[in-house]
């Protein structure tokens, strides 16, 4: 009976949780290595949910998903569609989302679109449970859940219902805010582009409230082919021009070896909020911009509006608005990775004040067999992991780590656990 159950539910070498750019890239490399990965998630879900009219901030040549043969890059998809993906010409986010779907159909095994609700330790390695209650057994797991679990909303706004406060990532379309007074919180690309789109979608009034003392804009990128002196002075990278960006882009492994305090400081300061060069003209429709301001309190008024207490350079003020959109980014905190079993989560070593999971060589966490990809690894590997560009560095190395861990497990059994882990977590062999 036990043998029959084991055959019906074999132990998988690798389960990939998440089907965004990182999850799909990891699955493509794993499939090419013969690991037969199982991948869960709706392909490019967060990208499909973005409002129409948004554009990629990154250059097309820095926006490839990763497969080992480099056969399914964004340039290949664009060529197949008769689209010119050129340096300095922004591409619609919808085009990039469709590219991810195309990549999924060609480079990875069939994607199981169910949501994984739990990854827990088990004798074989891990038990992976889906939304409908099915549990798979896996020797290794790659957690590539993207950014949506890590939404950051300013503290004074968190207690308000979603009817009054949303994160910018909640909006597939902005038509529902037409005719309303909307306050957008933040000064980065998401805030500035959301505000511009709201103005174009017929919002009655749009304002920006941001702690930043000024708006920062990226400059028009220089030509790809330049003279040797210009190239030497400010080399192109997938994260923008300049030698600092080149180090972030080309050497995430070196970033990981920096002292923890240095990594934390750079993570907080590198590639800070800025609008794309092509957005600046569109943003001209937004005239109410309040910089150097922070929200200290928020409440719903008797006439169904939101009252914001705001502190700024000239003292305190009160704003009333119909809706608040928090375009305030994401925090890669382990506490927000709810898909991980609580006991497993508490056993992981962390880095930085936000308690991101420590990510070791080849993207393995401190729990053997649990691998991490994407935003969760940025405090360890640097700012490139906040962007699609980082998938190219991650995918092949992570799969190399999986293969190494499987060999270390020996004989196809469990990959092992931290010392004392079985007893501490109540896992029975």
For each predicted feature, which ranges?
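Flavin (FAD/FMN) cofactor-binding and adjacent substrate-gating region
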Residues: 49-82, 235-256
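Dinucleotide-binding Rossmann-like beta1-alpha1 core, especially the glycine-rich loop
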Residues: 44-45, 50-65, 80-106
């Amino acid at each position: 009976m036990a043998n029959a159950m084991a055959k019906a539910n074999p132990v998988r070498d690798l389960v990939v949780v998440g089907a965004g750019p990182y999850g799909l890239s990891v699955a493509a490399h794993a499939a090419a290595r013969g690991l037969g990965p199982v991948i869960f998630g709706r392909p490019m879900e967060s990208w499909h949910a973005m409002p129409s009219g948004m554009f990629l901030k990154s250059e097309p040549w820095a926006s490839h998903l990763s497969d080992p043969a480099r056969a399914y890059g964004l340039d290949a998809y664009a060529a197949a569609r008769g689209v010119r993906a050129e340096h300095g010409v922004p591409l619609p986010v919808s085009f990039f989302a469709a590219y991810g779907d195309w990549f999924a159909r060609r480079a990875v095994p069939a994607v199981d679109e169910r949501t994984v609700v739990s990854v827990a330790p088990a004798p074989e390695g891990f038990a992976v449970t889906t939304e409908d209650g099915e549990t798979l057994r896996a020797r290794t797991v790659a957690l590539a859940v993207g950014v949506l679990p890590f939404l950051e909303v300013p503290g004074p706004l968190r207690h308000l219902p979603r009817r009054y406060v949303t994160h910018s990532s909640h909006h597939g379309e902005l038509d529902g805010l037409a005719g309303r007074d909307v306050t957008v919180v933040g000064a980065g690309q998401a805030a500035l582009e959301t505000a511009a789109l709201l103005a174009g979608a017929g919002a009655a009034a749009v304002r920006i409230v941001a702690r930043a003392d000024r708006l920062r804009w990226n400059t028009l990128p220089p030509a790809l082919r330049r003279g040797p002196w210009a190239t030497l002075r400010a080399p192109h990278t997938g994260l923008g021009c300049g030698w600092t960006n080149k180090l972030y882009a080309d050497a995430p492994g070196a970033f990981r070896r920096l002292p923890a305090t240095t990594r934390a400081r750079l993570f907080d300061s590198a590639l800070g909020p800025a609008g794309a060069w092509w957005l600046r003209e569109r943003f001209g429709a937004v005239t109410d911009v309040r910089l150097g301001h922070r929200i200290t309190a928020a409440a719903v008024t008797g006439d169904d509006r939101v009252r914001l207490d705001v502190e700024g350079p000239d003292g305190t003020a009160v704003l009333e608005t119909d809706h608040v959109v928090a375009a305030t980014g994401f925090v890669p905190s382990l506490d927000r990775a709810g898909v991980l079993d609580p006991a497993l989560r508490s056993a992981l070593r962390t880095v930085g004040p936000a308690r991101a999971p420590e990510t070791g060589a080849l993207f393995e966490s401190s729990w053997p067999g649990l691998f991490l990809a994407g935003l969760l690894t940025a405090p360890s590997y640097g700012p490139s992991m906040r962007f699609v560009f980082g998938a190219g560095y991650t995918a092949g190395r992570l799969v190399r780590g999986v293969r190494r861990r499987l060999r270390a497990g020996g004989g196809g059994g469990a990959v092992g656990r931290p010392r004392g882990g079985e007893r501490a977590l109540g896992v029975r062999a």
